[in-house]
């Protein structure tokens, strides 16, 4: 199929989403003010939300990785290494919360340690996988809240032609998109929007 900047999967097993949501409730007490990529600081004019971090050693990491690979095979065909930082962001957006227009990655690279594919675990000195500069290539967001349980909070994208479009709000929808795509989370008007968010790194663009 032709390359699309976003890839959506809306038919993930609902029973798995329910199990996932129940299992990660233990991370609710770890929620803290969300920071902004780049300067690693709280910037309420840019982003207002709370999040905790779930290590990819958790079974959810491998489960999501399976679908990331599926999206990559079917659409992107990028060279990928692993989930950035070995963690997945578990995010809560309460009434009044938002994330303004931003991108998750560009052509700039950052040093990453050697990591074991699909786990986020650092490799031992006697193992080799990759080392050095990496770039964020794909971003993903898994909708955990029923659309009827909150108003606002839409994930909105804008393409190179200036056209805007929204991701599906259906619970259990996995959205995978090119990290260079401009997007935002619109202000939540009521209720609570929960999601799992992460980024996938690979070698520098060629």
What does each model-identified segment do?
Residues 1-174, 180-206:
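Fe(II)/2-oxoglutarate oxygenase catalytic core
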């Amino acid at each position: 199929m032709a390359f699309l900047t976003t890839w959506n999967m809306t038919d993930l097993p609902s029973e798995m989403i329910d199990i996932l949501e129940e299992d990660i409730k233990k991370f609710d007490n770890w929620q803290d003010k969300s920071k902004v990529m780049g300067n690693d600081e709280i910037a309420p004019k840019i982003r207002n939300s709370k999040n905790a971090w779930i290590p990819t050693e958790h079974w959810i990491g491998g489960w999501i990785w399976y679908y990331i690979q599926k999206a990559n095979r079917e659409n992107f065909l990028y060279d990928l290494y692993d989930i950035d930082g070995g963690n997945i962001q578990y995010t809560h957006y309460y009434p009044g919360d938002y994330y303004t227009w931003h991108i998750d990655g560009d052509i700039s690279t950052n040093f990453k340690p050697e990591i074991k594919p699909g786990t986020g675990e650092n490799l031992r000195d006697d193992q080799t996988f990759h080392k050095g500069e990496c770039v964020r290539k794909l971003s993903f967001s898994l909708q955990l809240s029923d659309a009827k349980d909150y108003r606002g909070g839409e994930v909105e994208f804008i393409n190179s032609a200036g056209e805007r479009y929204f991701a599906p709000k259906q619970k259990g929808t996995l959205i995978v998109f090119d990290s260079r795509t401009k997007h935002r989370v619109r202000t939540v008007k009521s209720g609570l929007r929960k999601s799992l968010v992460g980024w996938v790194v690979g070698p520098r663009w060629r």
